[in-house]
């Protein structure tokens, strides 16, 4: 899961050694990104870490994990649409660094999900494969940009706010999905 992979990323970074990511679910793009999510009861931050040298994802295991996790991964990917809009706005208004290649890869990842939404089904290895591939490319966009901007914007800020105020927050991707709907309405 995400916590174990984040610990491996941080340890890899701290010891300056390679690591291999072996996700058992496909619930977020952290399986390949060069950032680790550090959470405690009051805050959530991202720390610089190593991206994996390889990812080994067994599509059968992922397909047999709870479908809610795969759905959360899809919602995390769809949030790339608002993340890119936010990044473009920051570039235009604040002259923030912007990478067209990272943005394009991020949008492509989100579009692969929306274009294939009808074929993403519980227990189907092809569904797991598609979601893992798109999570992988979304995480690669983060590596290209050198920041989380291609995959994290106002919808993620909304999710972090929910983490603080809810007694029992939902899955990260679920919260980002709701945040995406709200933020896209503002655009």
Task: Go through each PLM region and give its residues.
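Basic, gly/Ser/Thr/Pro-rich low-complexity segments located predominantly at protein N termini
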Residues: 6-7, 35, 144, 178
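N-terminal small/polar loop signature for handling phosphorylated ligands or for N-terminal nucleophile
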Residues: 1-20, 119-130
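Gly/Ser/Thr-rich loops at beta-strand to alpha-helix junctions
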Residues: 1-5, 27, 148
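Generic hydrophobic alpha-helical membrane-span motif
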Residues: 8, 29, 64, 160-162
């Amino acid at each position: 899961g995400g916590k174990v992979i984040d610990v491996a990323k941080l340890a890899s970074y701290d010891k300056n050694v390679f690591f291999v990511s072996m996700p058992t679910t496909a619930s977020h793009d952290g399986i390949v990104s060069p950032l680790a999510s550090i959470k405690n009861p009051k805050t959530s931050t991202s720390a610089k870490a190593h991206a994996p040298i390889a990812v080994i994802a067994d599509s059968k295991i992922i397909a047999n994990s709870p479908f809610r996790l795969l759905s959360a991964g899809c919602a995390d990917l769809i949030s790339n649409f608002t993340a890119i809009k936010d990044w473009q706005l920051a570039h235009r208004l604040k002259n923030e660094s912007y990478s067209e290649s990272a943005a394009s890869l991020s949008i492509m990842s989100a579009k692969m999900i929306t274009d294939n939404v009808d074929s993403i089904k519980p227990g189907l290895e092809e569904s797991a494969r598609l979601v893992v591939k798109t999570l992988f490319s979304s995480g690669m966009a983060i590596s290209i940009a050198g920041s989380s901007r291609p995959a994290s914007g106002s919808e993620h800020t909304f999710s972090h706010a929910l983490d603080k105020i809810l007694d029992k927050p939902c899955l990260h991707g679920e919260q980002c999905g709701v945040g995406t709907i709200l933020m896209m309405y503002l655009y």
